UniProtKB/Swiss-Prot annotation:
CDD domains the UniProt entry points to: GIY-YIG_UPF0213
Protein's organism: Invertebrate iridescent virus 6
Disulfide bond sites: none
Name of protein: Putative GIY-YIG domain-containing protein 242L
Listed InterPro entries: GIY-YIG_endonuc, GIY-YIG_endonuc_sf, UPF0213_domain
Pfam families, per database record: GIY-YIG
Domain GIY-YIG, chain residue ranges per copy: 5-81
Gene3D superfamilies: GIY-YIG endonuclease
Tree of life domain: Viruses
C-alpha cells in the first residue's frame, strides 16, 4: 500500500531561544496543540512559542521523519539558517550542508 504525501516538517522557537523540530500532516493544528500545552512535553511551559518555519513540500511520513531526524542533528546555526532563508527545499539544502 502506497502512503499518501502530506507530511511537513516544522520548527518552533521557545522563549529561551531553543528550537524544537517536529512533523505533522496539519502544521497549524499541531502548533495550536503545542501552544495549548497538549503537544510535546518538552515545549510545555516554554512559551510563548513561535512557529518559525515549516516545509512547503509535502513528504511521505517516512521522508518527513527522516528529514526531522536529520534536522534535529544539525547545529542551532544551521537551523537558524533554514528559518532565516525560509528554505523551500530542505532536503537539497541539507544535502549541500553535509558535503
Amino acid at each position: 500500500m502506497e502512503e499518501k504525501n502530506g507530511w511537513n516538517i516544522y520548527m518552533v522557537t521557545m522563549k529561551n531561544g531553543n528550537i524544537y523540530t517536529g512533523i505533522s500532516n496539519n502544521v497549524l493544528k499541531r502548533f495550536d496543540t503545542h501552544c495549548n500545552g497538549k503537544g510535546a512535553k518538552c515545549l510545555r511551559g516554554k512559551g510563548p512559542l513561535k512557529l518559525s518555519w515549516f516545509s512547503k513540500a509535502n513528504y511521505s511520513h517516512g521522508e518527513a521523519a527522516s528529514l526531522e531526524y536529520t534536522i534535529k542533528k544539525q547545529t542551532k546555526k544551521v537551523k537558524l539558517q533554514i528559518i532565516k532563508l525560509n528554505v523551500l527545499d530542505v532536503k537539497t539544502f541539507l544535502n549541500g550542508k553535509m558535503k
